[in-house]
């Protein structure tokens, strides 16, 4: 098995219990949102699920960040919830199978992605850098939902880093 320098960076700077807590929080918030949406009229159910999922995930992940000393930014509306662990800024992103193209379009997400330029050099060093120095980076926890009320709507189909 090939050793991953990026995985080593993550293990070095992010505690395992933070990942476990994030995973539990994502599934719990998703289930809570699904249960809430089931009480709505059928015509509003998909919209209610999406809105409530967004709010529940933000609130629950914010609580996980607080409990794990990740200094989350202020919880407010559509703002991205960010936590910090070592060199990493950790954020959650969700998308439905039918909306993947819009995943990282916001200005703030573009700024967070730009922080990973030094991680690119770890993966593929250039002539002027060996890629050993990574001052800061962003770790996206990406939740992929089905986008359907009939196919696995109560939880993410996958959660990836």
Where do the language-model regions lie?
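N-terminal short leaders/motifs
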Residues: 27-40, 89-104
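Localized chelating/binding microdomains
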Residues: 39, 84-90, 157-161
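A recognition module on extended beta-rich or small alphabeta surfaces enriched in W/G with H and D/E
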Residues: 91-159
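Nuclease catalytic cores
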Residues: 50, 54, 58
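A short acidic/basic microdomain associated with nuclease active sites
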Residues: 47, 65-91
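Interdomain/boundary linker segments immediately adjacent to catalytic/signaling cores
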Residues: 1-51
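Solvent-exposed interaction surfaces and binding hotspots enriched for charged
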Residues: 3, 85-86, 103, 128
């Amino acid at each position: 098995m090939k050793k991953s320098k990026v995985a080593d960076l993550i293990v070095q700077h992010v505690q395992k219990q933070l990942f476990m807590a994030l995973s539990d929080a994502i599934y719990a918030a998703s289930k809570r949102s699904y249960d809430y949406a089931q009480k709505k009229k059928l015509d509003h159910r998909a919209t209610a699920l999406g809105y409530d999922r967004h709010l529940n995930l933000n609130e629950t992940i914010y609580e996980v960040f607080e409990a794990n000393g990740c200094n989350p930014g202020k919880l407010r509306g559509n703002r991205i919830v960010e936590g910090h662990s070592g060199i990493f800024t950790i954020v959650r992103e969700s998308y439905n199978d039918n909306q993947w193209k819009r995943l990282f379009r916001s200005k703030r997400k573009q700024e967070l992605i730009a922080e990973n330029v030094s991680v690119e050099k770890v993966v593929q060093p250039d002539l002027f850098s060996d890629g050993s120095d990574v001052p800061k980076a962003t770790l996206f926890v990406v939740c992929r939902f089905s986008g359907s009320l009939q196919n696995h709507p109560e939880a993410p189909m996958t959660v990836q880093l």
